[in-house]
Curated annotation (Swiss-Prot):
GO cellular component terms given for this protein: microtubule; microtubule cytoskeleton; plastid
Positions bound to GTP: 11, 69, 138, 142-144, 204, 226
Location in or out of the cell: Cytoplasm, Cytoskeleton
GO MF: GTP binding; GTPase activity; metal ion binding; mRNA binding; structural constituent of cytoskeleton
Keywords: Cytoplasm, Cytoskeleton, GTP-binding, Magnesium, Metal-binding, Microtubule, Nucleotide-binding
Cofactor(s) the protein needs: Mg(2+)
Lineage: superkingdom: Eukaryota
Family from the record: Belongs to the tubulin family.
Positions of the UniProt region annotated as Disordered: 425-449
UniProt main location, coarse: cytoplasm
Signal sequence segment: none
The protein's name: Tubulin beta-6 chain
Assembly description: Dimer of alpha and beta chains. A typical microtubule is a hollow water-filled tube with an outer diameter of 25 nm and an inner diameter of 15 nM. Alpha-beta heterodimers associate head-to-tail to form protofilaments running lengthwise along the microtubule wall with the beta-tubulin subunit facing the microtubule plus end conferring a structural polarity. Microtubules usually have 13 protofilaments but different protofilament numbers can be found in some organisms and specialized cells.
Amino acid sequence: MREILHIQGGQCGNQIGSKFWEVVCDEHGIDPTGRYVGNSDLQLERVNVYYNEASCGRYVPRAILMDLEPGTMDSVRTGPYGQIFRPDNFVFGQSGAGNNWAKGHYTEGAELIDAVLDVVRKEAENCDCLQGFQVCHSLGGGTGSGMGTLLISKIREEYPDRMMLTFSVFPSPKVSDTVVEPYNATLSVHQLVENADECMVLDNEALYDICFRTLKLTTPSFGDLNHLISATMSGVTCCLRFPGQLNSDLRKLAVNLIPFPRLHFFMVGFAPLTSRGSQQYRALTVPELTQQMWDSKNMMCAADPRHGRYLTASAMFRGKMSTKEVDEQMINVQNKNSSYFVEWIPNNVKSSVCDIAPRGLSMASTFIGNSTSIQEMFRRVSEQFTAMFRRKAFLHWYTGEGMDEMEFTEAESNMNDLVSEYQQYQDATADDEGEYEEDEDEEEILDHE
C-alpha cells in the first residue's frame, strides 16, 4: 500500500540514489542480497513502500536507474548494495549527454526514454496503490537535468494524479563543474515549475559548508555530501515507512507546504549534525534538535532563510519523544521569530513524529521549509544565465541539437517570474489583500491565453 517509485538519473542522481538505498536498507534490516536480517517487526510492517517482495522472500527496491553512459551504473552495480537492484531496471545508453541539456532532453535522452518508461510502467503495475514518484537528479549536467525533466513530463502525462517529488541538486555559486551549468539549470527549472509537485533543493556548496564547518571534515568528499543528502531523504520519507503518532505522506506534505502551485521549491535541513569526534558530548533533546534544525547554517542549499520569510514549514521528528514537547518547541520558534514567518498564513508550521529513530541516534529531525529566500538561488543562476546568453555564448551546442533560442528566452523569463512571485509574497502583509485579487485576475487571463 502507498508505494513510492524511486528514479535516479545521471551521474549525480545515481550516486545520491545509491547512497539513499544504503541508508534505507540499513533502516529496514535488509542486507545487500535483499534478505531480511533485522530484529524488529516494525522494519517489515511497511517495507513495501520502497520494496517489492520477490517470490523467494528477497526484497527488491522499487528503483529505476537511468543514465546516458554506462560508467556510473557500473560503479553502482559493483558498489556495496549493487546486487540488490533488479537487473532489468538499469537503463543506460552509450553516448553520454556531455553536460548538454538538449542532448538529454531532445536527442540522446529522447531515444532512451521509451525504454525507461517501459520499466516505470512495469514497476507501477507491481504497486498496490502507487502514491507517487521520487526523482534524484542534478540540474547542472545533461542527463539528470535534460533527460530527468523529460521523464518527469512523460510521467506527468501518464500518471497525472500521482505525486511527483524531486531531489534536485542545483549548481553552486562557487563550486562549478561545467561552464554551461546556468543554461542547464534554467532550462530544468522551467520544466520543474510546471511538472513537479515538490522539489527539495540541494546544493553542493551548502553541503560542503556543513561538512566543513559543522562536521569538521577537512577534505569533504562527494561520499560525505551524499551521506547528508541520504539522511535527509530518509527523514522525509520515514513517516511513510514506519508507524508514528503524527504521520504524513507526500500529498499531506504538499497540501501543508504549498500555498501557491508554482512555489514548490523547498529548503531542507537535518539535525543533529555533529562531528564524529564530539557525538558523545552532546545531549539530544527536542529543544536542541529544534534549535539546530531552524539554524540557517543547517540548510542544504545556499540561501539564507533570514533574508526572506517562511510561507510554510514542516518538521519531521524521529525517535521516542513527547508530541506535546514537539508542539511546544515549534510554537516557541514561531513566537520568538515571528517576523520570519508570513502573518497571513496562521499556524504555518506542521510537525510530524515517527517513532523509529535513524541508526545510531536516539532522536533526529528533518526540516522542510518553503521560504521566500530561496529566490536567492534562482536569482544567482539567472544572473549567470543572462551574462552568457546576452553574448549567445555556448548556444551552438544547444541549437545544434535542434533547440531554438526562443526556448532559452522563455525559460529565462519563467525563472525571473518565479523570483518576483517569491518577492511579492515576501513583501505581502495581512492587510493589503485588495491588491492581490487584481493581480490574480491578470494572472488567470494570462493562463488562458
